[in-house]
Curated annotation (Swiss-Prot):
The keyword Ribosomal protein does not apply. Its main location: Golgi. InterPro entries: Cation/H_exchanger_TM, KEA4/5/6-like, Na+/solute_symporter_sf. The gene is KEA4. It comes from Arabidopsis thaliana. This is K(+) efflux antiporter 4. Belongs to the monovalent cation:proton antiporter 2 (CPA2) transporter (TC 2.A.37) family. KEA (TC 2.A.37.1) subfamily. It comes from the Eukaryota.
Amino acid sequence: MRRCKNNTDKFSVITMRLLTLLLICTFFFFFSFAYSAESDNETDSVVTREINGTVVESNATSAKPREDSFADMIDRALEKEFPDNDQNEVPDPGSFNNSVADQQAVLETVARVKPKKNETKTKEEKSFFNLDNENGVEDTPRLIDRKDNVFIMSNPKSKYPVLQLDLRLISDLVVVIVSATCGGIAFACAGQPVITGYLLAGSIIGPGGLSFVSEMVQVETVAQFGVIFLLFALGLEFSAAKLRVVRAVAIPGGLLQIFLFMCLSGITASLCGGKLTEGIFVGAFLSMSSTAVVLKFLMERNSISALHGQITVGTLILQDCAVGLLFALLPVLGGTSGVLQGVLSMAKSLAILIAFLGALFVLSRTWVPWFLKLMTSLSSQTNELYQLAAVAFCLLVAWCSDKLGLSLELGSFAAGVMISTTDLAQHTLEQVEPIRNFFAALFLASIGMLIHMHFLWNHVDILLAAVLLVIVIKTVVVAIVVKVFGYNNKTAVLVGMSLAQIGEFAFVLLSRASNLHLIESKLYLLLLGTTALSLVTTPLLFKLIPAVVHLGVLLRWFSPDSSTEIGFKGELYHSESAKRISLMIQGSLHDS
């Protein structure tokens, strides 16, 4: 009874702290919003005193920051740092037409060739392109790009099927895979993380480097399988008992982190004379961490089962779940939809998420075990069919999640969790692991291709300062949130440092905000360079974790046994949560 009472008191204290923090943040948020609205009203009142000829010009500038404000000083500094010619180095997706930009496609000029009816061709040429039809006329148009690649639009009247090869995609994939392998080998021989080698290799061969791969849309599409299989493997290793211990901080704590970043950025922008909407977007932008990169490091260091690893993974999963809500918020911030419409859109996304997870839960209890047993019986001699079925199941759930307006990442993780509830989770992981490693390397190399080394070198001073500021702020905010939920200093700092980068999904969020004209070009370039540089410095940040833990022990911030707990190889965590998990496992074994 006394233990239950202590747990209840501890939960009450955590709840009171959380409510107090939310009330304070909400108060400052509405205060800054009211302050910004009052400033806009004062500006409008000044405009009405002007003559009629200058009213239109004043209204156009009323939404801009106040003169001589801190935000105006920052704008002038950014205009000097990122002139207009930098737009050519890092193209803005918002400069394309809306249909192309929304689909994240590449706009390219091509020539459409429609031959004449009386044009004569050789027999071999007709046979290769299947040009022989009933009328003897070629009615299939061709497209020729700037590099003389020929694309057949359609071939409805061909007599015989011909395999059409995309040699451009094959050559690009060969370059990316070979360069990623060389980069990984070089960094492995130097005793450094291979992830850094993948990122650096991609930046060298990409458009910002030697330009071996100039058009990245096809490579990026194939590389997206890396994120899908990474999260699928993570779902296969999912443990409900371990996540149950950290769910109190992973779910409300993750939401609190996003809310805090949005509030702090919005308040800072308002007090400095900037736009409140830009500040809120920057907060949402900074709250996203790199799921693929962090998971890769945690897997390499065997830290998934650690306490800080479980909290980190839970927070990353929650961020993936919140992606749809953030996309619904962007039109509201950009002024393209009303507040009521934005709230309804977010409520719709939340309802779809709950219904989708509920349907998957029912399938995981009924259909999935039967399906896996069937595949096992059919794959008694070889695992080929079982491996193919596991991959197909992952892709199907991820595709359904994407079609419902959720994310591919959420669907692939949910597919892994569905299989983790069965007895074949470990067998499935062994079958999928080689595929995961291959596509993960391809994905990280494609992320490296987004990094323009020339652009980073020209603005390394301001971008490095921005990255250091992001690392410090994210580490402090995340550590405070974790500490509020009753965890020790060591766990809070480790979670903060693990999430102290900007995720690769922020590129998509940034592109969508640029299409909605939510941010200006100079801020777009600053955030783009900061995100790229933060991904490059993430391996170094993980290398510094043991040194930070050792320093914390010397300064008596952490317990003396923290340095042994953070050995990263076969890491165990010595906490009340770990003891509860071990007792639960021992009890289940004893009962069996």
